[in-house]
């Protein structure tokens, strides 16, 4: 008998988002790693494959500060019209409907320069992601996150 599969859908607007800030930067984001049991607001669903997912939002004028991630990351911009992105020395702007690829361990960040809330889905190429920020992220109190 084949394995029984059930549909497990997660509505992005239903995710419990955790506010994340840094004292020494304009970082002010809301984030969820929906399939990571290590994250405080997990959905309880765990992925079986070798990947991980992040959802985050940036209000106008706020940023997700410079950080590195251990695996490669594919970012999909779901909403937003003028999101500044830095990946290593490269600089550019993305908007809703565009993707960008971030190599492993390359410093990168995002700043919402547009008038509306920007929303993103990020897909990591490894099940475990180690993210390192330049300074501690509150309310977690750490600069290195493992999800």
Tell where the protein language model's regions lie, with residue ranges.
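A short, N-terminal "cap"/entry segment at the start of jelly-roll beta-barrel domains
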Residues: 1-50, 135-147
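Double-stranded beta-helix
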Residues: 8, 111-147
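Conserved short histidine dyad/triad with adjacent acidic residue
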Residues: 36-41, 52-69
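Short histidine-centered beta-strand/loop micro-motifs
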Residues: 43-48, 63-69, 86, 93, ...
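Conserved GNAT-family N-acetyltransferase fold
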Residues: 56, 75, 100
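Conserved metal-binding segment of the jelly-roll/cupin
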Residues: 59, 87, 94-113, 123-125
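A short beta-strand-loop-beta hairpin characteristic of the jelly-roll/cupin
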Residues: 68, 72-96
């Amino acid at each position: 008998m084949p394995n029984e599969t059930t549909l497990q859908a997660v509505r992005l607007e239903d995710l419990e988002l955790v506010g994340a800030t840094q004292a020494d930067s304009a970082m002010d984001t809301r984030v969820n790693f929906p399939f990571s049991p290590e994250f405080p607001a997990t959905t309880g669903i765990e992925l079986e494959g070798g990947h991980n997912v992040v959802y985050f939002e940036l209000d106008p004028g706020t940023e997700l500060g410079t950080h590195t991630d251990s695996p490669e990351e594919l970012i999909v911009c779901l909403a937003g019209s003028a999101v500044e992105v830095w990946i290593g020395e490269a600089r550019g702007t993305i908007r809703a409907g565009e993707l960008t690829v971030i190599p492993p361990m390359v410093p990168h960040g995002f700043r919402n320069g547009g008038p509306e809330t920007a929303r993103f889905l990020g897909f990591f190429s490894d099940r475990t992601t180690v993210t390192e920020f330049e300074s501690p992220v509150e309310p977690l109190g750490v600069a290195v996150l493992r999800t």
